[in-house]
Amino acid sequence: VVSVIKNLSNTSCPWDLAEFGGVARYASHWALGVIDGGGGRCFPGGHASAGFAFVGGYFALRRKQPVAARWWLAGAVLMGLVLGGSQQVRGAHFMSHTLWTGWLCWTTGWLVALAAVALRPRIAAFLHSTPAPVAD
């Protein structure tokens, strides 16, 4: 999800902005279709998503192992913030990029968990069905 949005994004990195020695002018990452004069493809944060991607494990663990799920979530959020923070120090992202990346990863994990719960009866029925004989 993050890679797709990033490839479609016109938002440039902070280091590309004129205020910080680049050539781009600031434009909100929500100003869709606005070309800021820079390279774009800077929103959301790819490095942060490497950590935040693991929030999906929380949804897998939360019902049967809630304590482990909370620890898993804390680790994933911490890694996302550390990786996103390291990019901010370099000038590659704003804090908003990191926070929105976390939200995107959380929402994706939540939607996948909802789909898994909704599809569980169908998957179980499929796995326990007897295949029809094949005619020669």
Model-predicted regions and their roles:
Residues F20-A27:
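Juxtamembrane inter-helical linkers in multi-pass membrane proteins
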Residues V1-F20:
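Transmembrane alpha-helix/helix-exit interface in multi-pass inner-membrane proteins
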Residues A27-D136:
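Membrane-embedded catalytic cores of phosphoryl/pyrophosphoryl-handling enzymes
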